[in-house]
Amino acid sequence: MKITTIAKTSLALGLLTTGVITTTTQAANATTLSSTKVEAPQSTPPSTKIEAPQSKPNATTPPSTKVEAPQQTANATTPPSTKVTTPPSTNTPQPMQSTKSDTPQSPTTKQVPTEINPKFKDLRAYYTKPSLEFKNEIGIILKKWTTIRFMNVVPDYFIYKIALVGKDDKKYGEGVHRNVDVFVVLEENNYNLEKYSVGGITKSNSKKVDHKAGVRITKEDNKGTISHDVSEFKITKEQISLKELDFKLRKQLIEKNNLYGNVGSGKIVIKMKNGGKYTFELHKKLQENRMADVIDGTNIDNIEVNIK
């Protein structure tokens, strides 16, 4: 852990002195691409020389099964031809892959096109995007070079530029910021940046957090039918941004309650133990300035959702 911290700190200092962020990103991407291209041909040649039709399905399985198969066929080339076609290794990966990838994807891909209302298309597309979570990172803030300032986060030598909006603009000054967590959702921007996100910056945990907040859901569909549901929302942070709360809750509602299918209005209300509350309006995306707001995750009491 100390070596990783030293490496990231040295990289942070390099960014502060040079400011050449684009070049670093291109170099990191170039090294990543070249490394993956070299590894791919190494796994295929030894298997295709012995048995062309049977080595291809085994290429996706662990390399240990590839070594054992050619040794058995080399000892008995004529009689045990059936042993090669019916080993347990060929039967094992097929059911595993079908249950992991096909089962969860098939119901969603079949239902989504028939149930999505066109006016909710953009909201559903945004809240089903993949998200990233970086913890205990180093954030670097350089001098302002455009209309907005950025915190540069460098996990695994890829640079993510986090727009400092709302309260973050005054909260974080220029320099190096340690022990930073960032919740990232890549967004379109006017700065030609590939890895760009807004808000979602919090302080790293000082202790382990395992908190669950109850979620009560009331949904009225386009036919007037009202249904009720109860679930939980897991919180593992002392500090959590409204960006992360809003995104994860809506994504959970899309997956379990078909939010932005045929209905997409209503609100989410976060109720705190001290009596406070925070509201997300479902008919529109969370405002950018609120994406920087941070609350005490352990102080969340319960969550109420009304969809209509």
From Swiss-Prot:
Residues 32-117 are annotated as: Disordered. One of its GO terms (cellular component) is extracellular region. Residues 1-30 form the signal peptide. Residues 180-278 are annotated as: Sialyl Lewis X-binding. Residues 77-93 have a biased composition (Low complexity). Residues 33-47, 55-76, 94-114 have a biased composition (Polar residues). Keywords: Secreted, Signal, Virulence. It is found in: Secreted. InterPro entries: Enterotoxin (IPR008992), SSL_OB (IPR015282), Staph/Strept_toxin_CS (IPR006126), Staph_exotoxin (IPR008375), SuperAg_toxin_C (IPR016091), Superantigen_bac (IPR013307), Toxin_b-grasp_Staph/Strep (IPR006123). It comes from the Bacteria. Secreted protein that plays a role in immune innate response inhibition by interfering with host TLR2-mediated pathway. NCBIfam families: PRK13042.1. The C-terminal domain contains a V-shape binding site for sialyl Lewis X. Belongs to the staphylococcal/streptococcal toxin family. This is Staphylococcal superantigen-like 4. The gene is ssl4.
